[in-house]
Amino acid sequence: FQSREAMEYFLAHVCTSEWNEEQDGGRPIREAESLLLDQFPHYKSEILAFYGRWTEMLGGPIHGTVDILQGLKEKKQHGLYALTNWSAETWPKTEERFAFLSWFDGILVSGKENMKKPDVRIYRAICDRYGLEPASTLFIDDNHRNIEAAQRLGLQTIHFASPAQMETELNIILAQ
């Protein structure tokens, strides 16, 4: 992009968060790109670069959370499962990049399930797949809509704001 403003315009009006979330829900990337190319042909190279250069856009892990995850894994007292809104097509690249994802006992990727958080069915799916009892399962997420949906199913929750806040709340829950 020629400027930060041009990039922000593109992300706000062309490859929007809402558009990206549809791929997290299972829509194939080629189909998603075609929809935008029909509407915005003058942005062809940028639209194709959105997923074509996906790994360049990935941020790094939140290190404090990775440290907490590692501590939980080492204690071996609780099963660790991940429920992520992510495209099935970009997930393999993400797994390759972040070794800590292998520490989970199971991962449910929304794009593979054709549904995404906060759809309550995806919380049921992870509980059913891994034999988790909602009342004794803790769900941590940074999105309040996702927290509310998990609570409707009866999961315990922590609304993530920072690693320190999460660790404090986690220690309180685990001490009960």
What does each model-found stretch correspond to?
Residues 1-67, 87-90:
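N-terminal helical cap/lid subdomain that shapes the substrate entry/recognition surface
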Residues 38, 42, 71-77, 96, ...:
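Secondary-structure boundary motif
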Residues 61, 83, 115:
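Residue-level marker of regulatory loop/turn positions in helix-turn-helix DNA-binding domains and
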Residues 64-77, 103:
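Catalytic-core regions built around general acid/base machinery
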Residues 76-79, 155:
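A generic structural motif
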Residues 80-81, 137:
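Generic beta-sheet signal
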Residues 87-88, 92-176:
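Asp-based, Mg2+/Mn2+-dependent phosphohydrolase catalytic module
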